[in-house]
């Protein structure tokens, strides 16, 4: 019967049913073979007993029974081997069917994913990602520039002072010494005198710068 509870059996159910029938047949063949092997041993024992008693006619008849019994044992062994081969084929069919069902499910899932993954949308997402990344890079660069501008003036001034000090040290000069050589005046000055003092101070600074420049030129010529 290929119907189960009013519905048609699936291929998997039919395979399981046939597999159970084959296993049952192999068990029955094993039981019959064991009975024949037990009978074979009994016949051999009877043949030996009759031979000792000299009943050769009975021995000949029992020998024929022994031959038939051994032939049946070989047939049962062969039948069981054939049934086992069929059982293995059914098992292979079950495995192949299971693999086919699994592949069917995977194929269906792949189809669903392919339908969900729309290329234009993916391209749009990637373009938007690249745009946002560029904006982020630009903002980061602007922030770095702002930080450099805020910190750069102080660093540049310190670096410039360090360079001037190094040059003067190499020349054996001192900025403090140069400034101390400038002429200075004391006492209270009028507004006009203050103006003259400022002019004199500016002139003295200019002379000091000119003198320093002249020394640098002489060092270069040396």
Swiss-Prot record:
<feature type="coiled-coil region">
    <location>
        <begin position="195"/>
        <end position="222"/>
    </location>
</feature>
<dbReference type="GO" id="GO:0000776">
    <property type="term" value="C:kinetochore"/>
</dbReference>
<dbReference type="GO" id="GO:0043162">
    <property type="term" value="P:ubiquitin-dependent protein catabolic process via the multivesicular body sorting pathway"/>
</dbReference>
<dbReference type="GO" id="GO:0000815">
    <property type="term" value="C:ESCRT III complex"/>
</dbReference>
<dbReference type="GO" id="GO:0036258">
    <property type="term" value="P:multivesicular body assembly"/>
</dbReference>
<dbReference type="GO" id="GO:1902774">
    <property type="term" value="P:late endosome to lysosome transport"/>
</dbReference>
<dbReference type="GO" id="GO:0005886">
    <property type="term" value="C:plasma membrane"/>
</dbReference>
<dbReference type="GO" id="GO:0071985">
    <property type="term" value="P:multivesicular body sorting pathway"/>
</dbReference>
<dbReference type="GO" id="GO:0010458">
    <property type="term" value="P:exit from mitosis"/>
</dbReference>
<dbReference type="GO" id="GO:0019904">
    <property type="term" value="F:protein domain specific binding"/>
</dbReference>
<protein>
    <recommendedName>
        <fullName>Charged multivesicular body protein 2a</fullName>
    </recommendedName>
</protein>
<comment type="subunit">
    <text>Probable core component of the endosomal sorting required for transport complex III (ESCRT-III). ESCRT-III components are thought to multimerize to form a flat lattice on the perimeter membrane of the endosome. Several assembly forms of ESCRT-III may exist that interact and act sequentially. In vitro, heteromerizes with CHMP3 (but not CHMP4) to form helical tubular structures that expose membrane-interacting sites on the outside whereas VPS4B can associate on the inside of the tubule. Interacts with CHMP1B, CHMP2B, CHMP3, CHMP4A, CHMP4B, CHMP4C and CHMP5.</text>
</comment>
<dbReference type="GO" id="GO:0006914">
    <property type="term" value="P:autophagy"/>
</dbReference>
<feature type="short sequence motif" description="MIT-interacting motif">
    <location>
        <begin position="210"/>
        <end position="220"/>
    </location>
</feature>
<feature type="modified residue" description="Phosphoserine">
    <location>
        <position position="184"/>
    </location>
</feature>
<dbReference type="GO" id="GO:0000785">
    <property type="term" value="C:chromatin"/>
</dbReference>
<keyword id="KW-0813">Transport</keyword>
<dbReference type="GO" id="GO:0005828">
    <property type="term" value="C:kinetochore microtubule"/>
</dbReference>
<feature type="region of interest" description="Disordered">
    <location>
        <begin position="179"/>
        <end position="198"/>
    </location>
</feature>
<dbReference type="GO" id="GO:0007080">
    <property type="term" value="P:mitotic metaphase chromosome alignment"/>
</dbReference>
<dbReference type="GO" id="GO:1903543">
    <property type="term" value="P:positive regulation of exosomal secretion"/>
</dbReference>
<feature type="compositionally biased region" description="Polar residues">
    <location>
        <begin position="179"/>
        <end position="188"/>
    </location>
</feature>
<dbReference type="GO" id="GO:0097352">
    <property type="term" value="P:autophagosome maturation"/>
</dbReference>
<dbReference type="GO" id="GO:0005635">
    <property type="term" value="C:nuclear envelope"/>
</dbReference>
<dbReference type="GO" id="GO:0090148">
    <property type="term" value="P:membrane fission"/>
</dbReference>
<dbReference type="Pfam" id="PF03357">
    <property type="entry name" value="Snf7"/>
</dbReference>
<dbReference type="GO" id="GO:0000421">
    <property type="term" value="C:autophagosome membrane"/>
</dbReference>
<comment type="function">
    <text>Probable core component of the endosomal sorting required for transport complex III (ESCRT-III) which is involved in multivesicular bodies (MVBs) formation and sorting of endosomal cargo proteins into MVBs. MVBs contain intraluminal vesicles (ILVs) that are generated by invagination and scission from the limiting membrane of the endosome and mostly are delivered to lysosomes enabling degradation of membrane proteins, such as stimulated growth factor receptors, lysosomal enzymes and lipids. The MVB pathway appears to require the sequential function of ESCRT-O, -I,-II and -III complexes.</text>
</comment>
<dbReference type="GO" id="GO:1901673">
    <property type="term" value="P:regulation of mitotic spindle assembly"/>
</dbReference>
<dbReference type="GO" id="GO:0061763">
    <property type="term" value="P:multivesicular body-lysosome fusion"/>
</dbReference>
<keyword id="KW-0472">Membrane</keyword>
<keyword id="KW-0175">Coiled coil</keyword>
<dbReference type="GO" id="GO:0030117">
    <property type="term" value="C:membrane coat"/>
</dbReference>
<feature type="modified residue" description="N-acetylmethionine">
    <location>
        <position position="1"/>
    </location>
</feature>
<feature type="modified residue" description="Phosphoserine">
    <location>
        <position position="203"/>
    </location>
</feature>
<keyword id="KW-0963">Cytoplasm</keyword>
<feature type="region of interest" description="Interaction with VTA1">
    <location>
        <begin position="217"/>
        <end position="222"/>
    </location>
</feature>
<dbReference type="GO" id="GO:0005765">
    <property type="term" value="C:lysosomal membrane"/>
</dbReference>
<feature type="coiled-coil region">
    <location>
        <begin position="12"/>
        <end position="53"/>
    </location>
</feature>
<comment type="similarity">
    <text>Belongs to the SNF7 family.</text>
</comment>
<dbReference type="GO" id="GO:0031468">
    <property type="term" value="P:nuclear membrane reassembly"/>
</dbReference>
<dbReference type="GO" id="GO:0010824">
    <property type="term" value="P:regulation of centrosome duplication"/>
</dbReference>
